[in-house]
Amino acid sequence: MIALEKLTYFYQHLPMRFDFHVKPGERIAILGPSGAGKSTLLNLVAGFLMADSGELRLNGESHRETSPAKRPVSILFQENNLFPHLTIGQNIALGLHPGLRLNAAQRATLQQIADRVGLTDLLDRLPSQVSGGQRQRAALARCLVRHQPILLLDEPFSALDPALRQEMLDLVESVCEERKFTLLMVSHNLDDAMRIAKRTVLIVDGQIYYDGPTQALQDGSADAAAILGISRSSSD
């Protein structure tokens, strides 16, 4: 589903290099210190940054040089990027048609997704008239209506309080199960990674430092857990 082979991007003349594969339907957490290259990795997959060399395949096709619109991915950022002058329903509809001219099937899709994320009664409200958690639900819904098989999450819930963050993680987990999404989720929170992904890729200085079970980072059994300030003794 996702294959990065010696994918290299030069940032201020320093190479960031990524090499790993993700199976269809697999959920991967991306962890690492601030500035390590986590968001860069997602932007390379999404097409907002173009790699200098290497190979990027999505769904078995090469996408290293294709535009974001032609890649089979949807991405959700920490900033929900909702347009303040459009209603929640219109913001979601942008995922279906940039001119908001929906046919009957698209309107049905929008309604179905709105029901799924709990926004049915809020479609006519402006973003300023709903809560932060509801705005992120709308941003997630805009991703879901696009029906792309790969979902990229770049710390979209980090600004939410713990209860709302857990609620959104539950929603993401259930939606991924239902739709068999392949997921890459950037996070600073190991507990969130444990909640979503059995496998974690740890990035340090633009390189993959660890690729393995999330549990081994949580319990300190992996040497790489020290990067996150975790040792076997501190996790006991």
Swiss-Prot record:
Signal peptide: none annotated. One of its GO terms (molecular function) is ABC-type thiamine transporter activity. GO terms for cellular component: plasma membrane. It is found in: Cell inner membrane. It is a peripheral membrane protein. Pfam families: ABC_tran (PF00005). InterPro entries: AAA+_ATPase, ABC_SmlMolc_Importer, ABC_transporter-like_ATP-bd, ABC_transporter-like_CS, P-loop_NTPase, Thiamine_ABC_ThiQ. Its main location: membrane. It catalyses: thiamine(out) + ATP + H2O = thiamine(in) + ADP + phosphate + H(+). PROSITE patterns: ABC_TRANSPORTER_1 (PS00211), ABC_TRANSPORTER_2 (PS50893), THIQ (PS51288). Part of the ABC transporter complex ThiBPQ involved in thiamine import. Responsible for energy coupling to the transport system. PANTHER family: SPERMIDINE/PUTRESCINE IMPORT ATP-BINDING PROTEIN POTA, THIAMINE IMPORT ATP-BINDING PROTEIN THIQ. Belongs to the ABC transporter superfamily. Thiamine importer (TC 3.A.1.19.1) family. This is Thiamine import ATP-binding protein ThiQ. The gene is thiQ.
